[in-house]
Amino acid sequence: MFLLYEYDFFWAFLIISILVPILAFFISGVLAPISKGPEKLSTYESGIEPMGDAWLQFRIRYYMFALVFVVFDVETVFLYPWAMSFDVLGVSVFIEAFIFVLILIIGLVYAWRKGALEWS
């Protein structure tokens, strides 16, 4: 017997969560003024006119450091559920997680040798 009625709340929430942003964009497009005057085209910075050049150039080192951080942050997200159910899953999952961590360590060593973790 199919128990599709158990998912009614899920489908209702999914439909509502799709319709609300679509309606919000549609209503804002209908109600928003179309003309762009000089005030709309001017630069705005914290309520006052900007002083100096507004363009900043970030070094690629910050980008690489952020990328390495995101990779290891995602690693934590993947390893936490594994650690919580370690005793139930068995040895094969331990070997898979070990290989996963080994690949990440190789990536860390590569990033370290390329200088992605140096601030100077």
From Swiss-Prot:
One of its GO terms (biological process) is photosynthesis, light reaction. The keyword Heme does not apply. Gene3D superfamilies: NADH:ubiquinone/plastoquinone oxidoreductase, chain 3. InterPro entries: NAD(P)H_OxRDtase_bac/plastid, NADH_UbQ/plastoQ_OxRdtase_su3, NDAH_ubi_oxred_su3_sf. Keywords: Chloroplast, Membrane, NAD, NADP, Plastid, Plastoquinone, Quinone, Thylakoid, Translocase, Transmembrane, Transmembrane helix, Transport. It is a multi-pass membrane protein. Belongs to the complex I subunit 3 family. It comes from Solanum tuberosum. This is NAD(P)H-quinone oxidoreductase subunit 3, chloroplastic. It is an enzyme of class 7 (translocase). Its main location: plastid. GO terms for molecular function: NADH dehydrogenase (ubiquinone) activity; quinone binding. The keyword Transmembrane helix applies.
